[in-house]
């Protein structure tokens, strides 16, 4: 078949366009630093990369959850540190009030100080992290502590001395294998419990002597005794306050275990994320040196076509 000028011209333009298209594609890959742009370019590798991307997305969710958990723990630590300081200062105030040299004015001053501590503790127990009340247990949408018309302290609507309280849980998924049973209950060891019960924090019920186990109420009862100058059984109340101060101190120290737990899983996720990102780069990334050489060769071929 005889080659006409038109056929030769069409062939030349076709080759020229093909060279330009290949050169542009390579340039695009270099700019994007990717080895392919479409799923159809490399289906097998693209599917592997999609799995890695899904894993990275999952890790990011866990990291955000751990960050929120750490924020809650930090706020909890700050708040309970304040309550711990108050309980220690309250002990010192009570000791001052029960010494033999204390007159009625000293006792009234101590009582006023203890009343102030009550208000501070109540405000602290209603501390929020973001939109959530951190001591609300499993009910974080409203302030957990309040006073009824008679001045009785309530926790989630129940009198702290006469109410019935249960263990409270609010779990977050941190990537250890969330497991939910048929009833919708989360397996305790499969997630992190960020719930902190205000009932546990301040105490509930009364002891065998009829003395309240609640720190807030205890301070009020002791203040009332100083106000009335009735110290006949003050030692029982002082001992109870010392017991509550010790309990608060133990809770404060135990925070470290939760922080260590979060740090451990944060480090594990960081390692997983690093490995996944490396794998993603291997699957999707481009060898720039090799790609630039290919681009240079394509550019030479294209320029040759223009001669």
Task: Place the predicted regions along the sequence by residue.
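Aromatic-anchored, glycine/proline-accented short structural segments
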Residues: 180-243
